[in-house]
Amino acid sequence: MIIGYFDGLCEPKNPGGIATFGFVIYLDNRKIEGYGLAEKPFSINSTNNVAEYSGLICLMETMLRLGISSPIIKGDSQLVIKQMNGEYKVKAKRIIPLYEKAIELKKKLNATLIWVPREENKEADRLSRVAYELVRRGKLRDIGCIILT
């Protein structure tokens, strides 16, 4: 069974802070990690939910490149998980294109998305915080996804 975790944050304020994300994939006896910058720092579109969706998209794009199918994907954002599972509607205009891309990737992967409490998502959270610190120090400037392992 292949399991992926994603997380996002926007600090020091939400919206309008630095939106970063992290993800981890457990693939057989390997661990693949990644993180990234979701949006231009301190912009109106820099939000926690944009970061969460960006982390999910980056995770699923990485899974597709690895040829993974039918993964279980876990995240601690109830909003994102419930929107992706059709339980909540997507209302925020800035989220709609991210949601549509994520749904397309979910279908391609045949992925199952499950909400988990924050305590079960520590690795992805840690990676989103690593990305945040790199942005703060000027070492991560480009929006996008970085695969670490």
Swiss-Prot record:
Changing R118A: 10-fold reduction in both RNase H and dsRNase activity. Residues 1-140 form the RNase H type-1 domain. It is found in: Cytoplasm. SUPFAM superfamilies: Ribonuclease H-like. It is an enzyme of class 3 (hydrolase). GO terms for cellular component: cytoplasm. Its main location: cytoplasm. It holds the Pfam family RVT_3. Mg(2+) 2 binds at D7, D125. InterPro entries: RNase_HI-like (IPR053576), RNaseH-like_sf (IPR012337), RNaseH_domain (IPR002156), RNaseH_sf (IPR036397). Mn(2+) 1 binds at D7, E52, D76. Changing E52Q: Loss of RNase H activity, loss of dsRNase activity. Does not complement E.coli double deletion mutant. The protein is hyperthermostable, melting temperature (TM) for wild-type is 102 degrees Celsius, for the double Cys mutant is 93 degrees Celsius and for a C-terminal deletion of 6 residues is 77 degrees Celsius. This is Ribonuclease HI. It comes from Sulfurisphaera tokodaii (strain DSM 16993 / JCM 10545 / NBRC 100140 / 7) (Sulfolobus tokodaii).
